[in-house]
Amino acid sequence: MLGTFEEVLAMPGRYLNDHCLIHHDDKWHLFGIHGNVRRPEDPIAIESSILHATSPDLRAWTIHPNVIERTGHWPELTHVYAPHVIAHHDRFFMLYCANDELGTQRICLATSNDLFTWERYDGNPVIVPSLSWSKWPGFGLPSRNEARQLIGRHDTVGIKDHYRFIARTGGTYGGCRDPHINLMPDGRFIAYWVSRMNESFGHNLVCVAASISEDLVHWQEIGPVYSQTAWPLDDEPTLEVESPCVVYKDNRWWLFFKNGWWTHVTSSPSPFDFRGQEVHRLGFVHAAEVLQWNDEWVITHCSADPTDYEYRRSNRTRGLFLGRLNWPTGHHPRLV
């Protein structure tokens, strides 16, 4: 399950992580997490701006100035990351994530007329999970001092300690990240995002949740649409379900998501509930975006060498990769 990928955007000394692609005026626009390559023993990279690049063909890229820089004020105290962009009424809407000083994640909104200049929405954040089902600060999560006693300072530990912190505390501080927006047939928008569920629903549950909107500004939560038990720390590098990408094809909604080393895919006739559907392991792909281009289904990969399926030597060192899917009607997709 290692597909053939071509590196189409290399940034020596830097890496690309979760990203999105949108086509406008004969150009592809890429927005994504980026950062400087660090040694494994160094602190977790601070991803404090959003990269912007353009391409006529998904292969030759021009990098432009960053479009979003963290403000240093709530809710953007430490990180801004994981953007997703959609067009509506001659404007562009970007949902992106922001972290406060505790690492609590919230989804914010920015808008643009040209994809180059962006204005934040004054009412940010626009999406946070409901306390009725989510793990959220003050509701079953440790305080800052308790976290320090577990492993030391959360913002200055290495990557292995970070995952150990997640395992011991039952999750990140208030998970709400990695939005992916789709236009539904009825004209409303649905945003998928990831979080963790509280213990009343079961032990150590992670999920893809969703919210709906008529204007991309005001969002009504649906709640979890897919959930599973998190992977054990010793077996996989990523405890969370993350990086959802949803595609409508063959009268079904196809949900791609990352968990562990792998990207998985499931589908449902409803965009609101993927639970109980068959899940297929697609392969080693990180933060995949799936789209149709020139009559082909293509898939992106990022951050690591596509042959380094255990992230042993290349995590957060590589740029954007492009691969292909074999996706016949009536079947789930496979890497080419």
What are these regions (language model features)?
Residues 1-336:
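Carbohydrate-active catalytic/glycan-binding domains of CAZyme proteins
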